[in-house]
C-alpha cells in the first residue's frame, strides 16, 4: 500500500512516502515480484501533493518493475482523507 498518507507511516519512509522516490518504490515492487509466485498489486496516491502529482509516470515505472495491477487513488497524500 503505497497510498497510505498517515504521518506515522510516512515518517518511516513507507506508505505514500515512497512516492517521493519512485526508484525506491520500483525496487520494492521488483523485490516482491521476484519473491512471490502470486501477482503483486500496488495502491498509490496520485502524488505527494497536487502540484507534484505524476501518477501515470509512477504507475508505468511500477508496472515495469513487475506490478500486475495498480490502483491510483485520486487524492494526493497531502490531502489525506479530505
Residue ranges and their predicted role:
Residues 1-82:
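Flavin-dependent oxidoreductase catalytic cores
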Amino acid at each position: 500500500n503505497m497510498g497510505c498518507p498517515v504521518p506515522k507511516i510516512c515518517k518511516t519512509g513507507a506508505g505514500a512516502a515512497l512516492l517521493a522516490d519512485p526508484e525506491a518504490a520500483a525496487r520494492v515492487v521488483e523485490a516482491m515480484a521476484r519473491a512471490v509466485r502470486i501477482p503483486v498489486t500496488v495502491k498509490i496516491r496520485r502524488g505527494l501533493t497536487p502540484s507534484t502529482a505524476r501518477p501515470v509516470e509512477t504507475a508505468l515505472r511500477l508496472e515495469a518493475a513487475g506490478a500486475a495491477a495498480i490502483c491510483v487513488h485520486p487524492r494526493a497524500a497531502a490531502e489525506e482523507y479530505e
